[in-house]
């Protein structure tokens, strides 16, 4: 049985005061939660502080991006080795904001995936279609292409222990969300697509939903059989709202 994972992506938000307050409150809100893994991805400069604040809890740390290179003359970049050194485990790659604003390609993202696996870190591979692609009926085509960038270069085994986050671009930060049935249909397609290569890997891979997940829609989303948690944006900046989502995942998967 897959163990759900709810991960908070703080994006470009944070301060020392916020890290202290938010992680302290998360510790209180999530005390006693054991049926759902929890991770947070603050901006890089706050990962170490957040890790110290989370010490003794079940909250794990992640990061929002990684460079291909492990060291060298690459100004402004952060390597997988560095993230590992400061205790980040779950590393988000391929987020639509990176694909859009930084023109990251499927090929580049697949290379980042490989580097993370080599370093023993957990890739959180974001995939999903734009509103135009959705309206053109290309959701499955886009998701398959983004997954195939890894499948065809690294094989299905690369997805062992990895996480996929389906994030319909039209639902990120817009307040819109795919209906539970819509999200489930895409999640099932993703799992079935990997199963064509390796059914065992497909069955164990965690597939999160990431599109305006909030306290009011979380329980219904998590009741779907192929939705294994969430990659949460705005709601992860409020301890009480994030905790409701985590507890909804725990309850749904124990039911």
From Swiss-Prot:
InterPro entries: Aldolase_TIM, TIM_sf, TrioseP_Isoase_bac/euk, Triosephosphate_isomerase, Triosephosphate_isomerase_AS. Substrate binds at residues 9-11, 173, 212, 233-234. PANTHER family: TRIOSEPHOSPHATE ISOMERASE. One of its GO terms (cellular component) is membrane. It catalyses: D-glyceraldehyde 3-phosphate = dihydroxyacetone phosphate. This is Triosephosphate isomerase. The keyword Isomerase applies. Its EC number is 5.3.1.1. Pathway: Carbohydrate biosynthesis; gluconeogenesis; Carbohydrate degradation; glycolysis; D-glyceraldehyde 3-phosphate from glycerone phosphate: step 1/1. The lineage of its organism: Bacteria, Pseudomonadati, Pseudomonadota, Gammaproteobacteria, Enterobacterales. Involved in the gluconeogenesis. Catalyzes stereospecifically the conversion of dihydroxyacetone phosphate (DHAP) to D-glyceraldehyde-3-phosphate (G3P). The active site is at residues 95, 167. Induction: Induced by CsrA and repressed by spermidine.
